[in-house]
Amino acid sequence: MFCNLSPMIDFDALKSEKGLILAVVQDQLSREVLMCAYMNREALEKTVETGITHFWSRSRQQLWKKGETSGHVQKVKEIRVDCDMDSLLLLVEQVGGACHMGYRSCFYRNLEGEVVGEKVFEPDEVYKS
């Protein structure tokens, strides 16, 4: 286990919707928000067990380990639960980029569509079919 989460909050105590809870992922040092994704019980348990983020893909309907294809993993340093117990904050050490579009953060555009984030890799080179 990556950190002292004992006793871990029971997933059933969290206010999930259809068995999923929102997870906000933030860089531990810079506090930059990297991404948001959903976790089910298995994803949270795998994350705690391995220290690497795991999420539930709503589109593929399956568990996925962040960085499994790209190598751009998120090493979990701390997990916090919000006051309403309906979302999680994961403080991580990001290896490479968090966004599958090649940016450090999934929040790389402003409302006008202007790119304001840092591109850290070329997706075509990482996600070869």
UniProtKB/Swiss-Prot annotation:
GO terms for molecular function: magnesium ion binding; phosphoribosyl-AMP cyclohydrolase activity; zinc ion binding. Its main location: cytoplasm. The keyword Chloroplast does not apply. It comes from the Archaea. Keywords: Amino-acid biosynthesis, Cytoplasm, Histidine biosynthesis, Hydrolase, Magnesium, Metal-binding, Zinc. Pathway: Amino-acid biosynthesis; L-histidine biosynthesis; L-histidine from 5-phospho-alpha-D-ribose 1-diphosphate: step 3/9. Transmembrane segments: none annotated. Zn(2+) binds at residues 83, 99, 106. Pfam families: PRA-CH. Catalyzes the hydrolysis of the adenine ring of phosphoribosyl-AMP. This is Phosphoribosyl-AMP cyclohydrolase. It comes from Methanosarcina barkeri (strain Fusaro / DSM 804).
